[in-house]
Amino acid sequence: VPHWQGEVGLCTDFFQLAMLSMERTKSIEIGSAVLSILANGGPIAVAERIGNFCALQEVRGDSRRLNVGFSAGRFQFMAAPYGIVPRNNVEDVAWSALRGKIFWEACEIMLRLIRGDTIHSDDIRETILNRNDFRTEEDWLTVQNAHGEDSEEIKIPRRYIFEEIKSIPQNWSRKQLNLVLGSHQPELQTHVNKFMPVQVFNLSITQPEVIEATHERMKESYMGDWERRMMPRTVMVFLNEEDGLSENEKIECANEEAKGALTSYWAALEGTLDPMKVEKAANNAIIGNAATVAEQICERFHPDDRLMLWFDFFKHDSSRICRDMRAFMDKVVPLVNGGGN
């Protein structure tokens, strides 16, 4: 990460945290946004953790869902310790495109194991590179040269090799699992729904027209009845409802807090995200006191959207984060839902 100082891309064991949280609460569901399935032991290990968690939930008599948002992980260093690195010169020069293809392979393995299939690595889709996978003709020519011939397609050996396997336990309720794919690729969003019902995330900076196109596509491809809330809208929240401040002072303080955090956010993205996405980015933050935050939500989001709120970016004051979340629920939500003045 070229322009970031501090912790990023942490691979925490989400399932242990989820179990502890559910043991201490009655109504709250827990989710990951997002879990890298190329890290964390890879797709087979993640599938086993999911099945084991949901089975234990049934034993405990807890019917709450586990919400697993999963992705390849933005940062290469997260997956590298798990062997997700180029294996030869062809893979090295093709890596920007190939890493995404490995994620396709991992998705199919994980989803089929979760579904209860018995699979062999030969059953999984092959990875094939062609010109369409690369931004420029020059990039594709570089890969062809490394391959040693100008083939229209280059077959890449599978990343995961295994004999017939299945995940144990087999008998658990899949209704207790909600899967959400963190990928902007339309083809992958459609592909994963061949195996299991999989909802979708988009980046917080995704343009509105892309959001609407995704909803239309998911109406056709989702394994089930698609609802708008099934694609959470990620948004950073810079809310100030601190005591002792006037309404204008709250807004000024919120803007100051947001300025520093968002500057760091954009710096962190540089070199880790497709520059075209950054260039076309949409506003990804709501900023101000309760009234202005509520107004921004009503102006920018569809009434049926579900918001996934990010309160803690660049904040290390846990008590302040808790106050902000409480203020959001007590003061912002009633205004958005029509219960306030």
Predicted regions and their residues:
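N-terminal beta1-alpha1-beta2 module of alpha/beta enzyme domains
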Residues: 1-28
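Acidic (Asp/Glu)-rich catalytic clusters
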Residues: 18-27, 53-65, 191-194, 218-226, ...
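Outer-membrane beta-barrel translocator/channel fold
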Residues: 69-87, 91, 95
